[in-house]
């Protein structure tokens, strides 16, 4: 199962009193927009009990065109990585163990 932003908004409506569906959608959208803009400005994000979004600079490296085998340079770029917290890893592992 995949959890969507719309489903997150529905969960907010169910669990938080006096939150309308439109308010919940806006809250979810604002949350993700803040994550996007923070990462775009070059800052990392640490969410306690969940994990860290970090930026990593990858240098230029050689690659190959799969059809022709020709060597093609892959340009340097910045990527976003996510590292789950130990608490999140433990929760996932515990849930997985219960399912078996």
Swiss-Prot record:
| Keyword Cytoplasm attributed | no
Q: Which InterPro entries match?
A: Hist_DNA-bd, Histone-like_DNA-bd_CS, IHF-like_DNA-bd_dom_sf, IHF_alpha
Q: Can you cite a GO biological process for this protein? A: positive regulation of metabolic process
Which keywords accompany this UniProt record? DNA recombination, DNA-binding, Transcription, Transcription regulation, Translation regulation
| GO CC term, one of those recorded | cytosol
Q: Which PROSITE patterns match?
A: HISTONE_LIKE
Q: Where is this region: Disordered?
A: 53-72
Kindly state the subunit structure of this protein: Heterodimer of an alpha and a beta chain.
Role: This protein is one of the two subunits of integration host factor, a specific DNA-binding protein that functions in genetic recombination as well as in transcriptional and translational control.
Which family is it part of?
A: Belongs to the bacterial histone-like protein family.
| Descriptive protein name | Integration host factor subunit alpha
Which gene produces this protein?
ihfA
